[in-house]
Amino acid sequence: MSATFTQTILFTDTDGRARWRERPIALTEGKPAAMLSPLMPSGGYQLRTSPVGFRSEFHCTGEPQWVFILGGQMEIFLQDGSSRVFSPGEHFYSADTLPAGTAFDAQLHGHWSRQLGPDPLVTLFVRG
């Protein structure tokens, strides 16, 4: 039996703009009742809480990291005007880093995010 986990990835495309894509991660370990991915490296984790009304400016991710929504809702906006909403239990891999040697341009690069709804946003960031 072959199982997969879908990794939603926010990445920097060749034109410098942030975009979304999905990649399957094979769950090749464990037992049929509890399939696991291979162990992945990580560089630590951080917890964050953002109050109702939080909104960031356009920015790029400093280091690639998994973002898990623990409470509240988070909306991510891209330069093309599109957005995605993530709710508790959902996740994405934030890898829209600024290309080496490139100066940040808030009209081209990155994404911005905001808290949605009546509850503070609580997130877990896992580097790696």
Where is each model-derived feature located?
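Short acidic, Pro/Gly- and aromatic-enriched capping/linker segments at domain boundaries
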Residues: 1-11, 81
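A short glycine-rich, His/Asp/Glu-containing loop-to-beta-strand
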Residues: 14-58, 64, 119-123
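Short acidic (Asp/Glu) patches
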Residues: 51-54, 72, 78, 98, ...
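Glycine- and acidic-residue-biased ligand/ion/polar-headgroup-sensing regions
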Residues: 62-80, 90
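Ubiquitin-like/PB1-type beta-grasp interaction modules and other compact soluble beta-rich domains
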Residues: 63, 82-85, 106-109
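Short acidic-glycine-tyrosine-enriched beta hairpin
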Residues: 80-98
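A short hydrophobic beta-strand segment most commonly corresponding to one strand
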Residues: 93, 102-128
